[in-house]
């Protein structure tokens, strides 16, 4: 089955198709992780995107449903150099090709993924069509011209109903913008009594459960695309201790009077270095975001920068000077990636 990667600038890469047969449009991004392809695919933050893996060998240890970060794959496509259809791992249940077929995801392998990555780094994230169907280049061009990138997927990935997970510890209200399972597991490990709310839940309904703390989850797209959530968070700030991760971090910035902006090609992978200003220590972290917090705008609104990216100096963490409010851009839960910064969950429950 022929596979095609058609980029916004007209560049075409030919490979072999796998997974679901079809044609999908999305924003192409690259991920630098060497492992964790299953967690990456099932991370709701990739909604609407086509993931290009820089590491050349994908699928070596198979697929085990227990490590999925959500119930399905929201990404539009998956690009790899080589796939292993005969994995060797005692926990493996199916191979990567079967996973993509089961989840309805178009895949292409056998292309130069490093070349694609260099192009994204030079050009920035761009529109892309991934195809293993029967469309010609001319038909793919027409599809490209008629399509636009959408940065509002939170409504798609957020829970549609309130979910309660009983625990014996602190009562935590979670605003779900596309939460990963391992974040929930970290809260459960700390005995939290968890109530997960849809992203657009009114602030009064959240306060009605009398939570000890409020957690803002990760999620896909542009934080400015969900103004209703920003307005609710504005009204919640200062009412209870609050902690945000990834998209939740950006929403806290906006709700506090700060600003966010789109990065040229984002940070995605399990090997991103950050500096913890308060601990005077560097950590390797998992990251997955295309937007960042504008530093000056949050400093003007009572924030202190707590973490910085060691590659480009962007804001990776902040806290308020006088109220129990903090957030980080990276993923302390890893999944996939290091878990050296899970102390942040302890910091939250101890506020």
Curated annotation (Swiss-Prot):
One of its GO terms (molecular function) is glutaminase activity. InterPro entries: Anth_synth/Amidotransfase, CarbamoylP_synth_ssu, CarbamoylP_synth_ssu_N, CarbP_synth_ssu_N_sf, Class_I_gatase-like, CPSase_GATase1, GATASE. Transmembrane segments: none annotated. Pfam families: CPSase_sm_chain, GATase. L-glutamine binds at residues 45, 219, 221, 247, 250, 288, 290-291. Composed of two chains; the small (or glutamine) chain promotes the hydrolysis of glutamine to ammonia, which is used by the large (or ammonia) chain to synthesize carbamoyl phosphate. Tetramer of heterodimers (alpha,beta)4. GO terms for biological process: 'de novo' pyrimidine nucleobase biosynthetic process; 'de novo' UMP biosynthetic process; glutamine metabolic process; L-arginine biosynthetic process. It catalyses: hydrogencarbonate + L-glutamine + 2 ATP + H2O = carbamoyl phosphate + L-glutamate + 2 ADP + phosphate + 2 H(+). NCBIfam families: CPSaseIIsmall, PRK12838.1. Small subunit of the glutamine-dependent carbamoyl phosphate synthetase (CPSase). CPSase catalyzes the formation of carbamoyl phosphate from the ammonia moiety of glutamine, carbonate, and phosphate donated by ATP, constituting the first step of 2 biosynthetic pathways, one leading to arginine and/or urea and the other to pyrimidine nucleotides. The small subunit (glutamine amidotransferase) binds and cleaves glutamine to supply the large subunit with the substrate ammonia. Its EC number is 6.3.5.5. Belongs to the CarA family. The active site is at 246 (nucleophile), 331, 333. Keywords: Amino-acid biosynthesis, Arginine biosynthesis, ATP-binding, Glutamine amidotransferase, Ligase, Nucleotide-binding, Pyrimidine biosynthesis. Pathway: Amino-acid biosynthesis; L-arginine biosynthesis; carbamoyl phosphate from bicarbonate: step 1/1; Pyrimidine metabolism; UMP biosynthesis via de novo pathway; (S)-dihydroorotate from bicarbonate: step 1/3. The gene is carA. The keyword Transmembrane helix does not apply. Residues 171-351 form the Glutamine amidotransferase type-1 domain. Residues 1-171 are annotated as: CPSase. This is Carbamoyl phosphate synthase small chain.
């Amino acid at each position: 089955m022929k596979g095609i990667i058609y980029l916004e600038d007209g560049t075409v890469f030919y490979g072999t198709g796998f997974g679901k047969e079809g044609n999908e449009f999305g924003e192409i991004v690259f991920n630098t992780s060497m492992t964790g392809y299953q967690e990456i695919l099932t991370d709701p933050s990739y909604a609407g995107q086509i993931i290009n893996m820089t590491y050349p060998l994908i699928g070596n240890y198979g697929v085990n449903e227990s490590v999925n970060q959500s119930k399905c794959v929201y990404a539009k496509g998956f690009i790899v150099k080589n796939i292993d259809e005969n994995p060797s791992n005692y926990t493996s249940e199916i191979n990567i090709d079967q996973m993509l077929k089961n989840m309805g995801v178009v895949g292409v392998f056998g292309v130069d993924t490093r070349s694609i990555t260099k192009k994204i780094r030079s050009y920035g994230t761009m529109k892309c069509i991934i195809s293993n169907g029967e469309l010609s280049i001319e038909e793919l061009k027409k599809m490209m011209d008629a399509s636009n990138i959408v940065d509002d997927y939170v409504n798609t990935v957020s829970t549609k109903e309130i979910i309660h997970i009983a625990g014996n510890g602190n009562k935590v209200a979670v605003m779900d913008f596309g939460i990963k399972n391992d974040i929930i597991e970290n809260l459960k490990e700390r005995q939290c009594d968890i109530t997960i709310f849809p992203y657009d839940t009114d602030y009064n309904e959240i306060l009605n459960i009398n939570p000890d703390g409020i957690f803002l989850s990760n999620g896909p797209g542009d934080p400015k695309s969900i103004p209703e959530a920003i307005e609710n968070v504005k009204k919640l700030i200062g009412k209870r201790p609050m902690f945000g991760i990834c998209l939740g971090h950006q929403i806290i910035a906006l709700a506090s009077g700060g600003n966010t902006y789109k990065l040229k090609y984002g940070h995605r992978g399990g090997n991103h270095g950050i500096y913890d200003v308060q601990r005077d220590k560097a950590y390797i972290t998992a990251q997955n975001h295309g937007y960042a917090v504008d530093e000056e705008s949050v400093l003007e609104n009572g924030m202190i920068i707590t973490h910085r990216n060691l590659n480009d100096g962007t804001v990776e963490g902040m806290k308020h000077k006088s109220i129990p409010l903090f957030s980080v851009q990276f993923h302390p839960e890893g999944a996939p990636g290091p878990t050296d910064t899970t102390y942040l969950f302890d910091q939250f429950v101890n506020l």
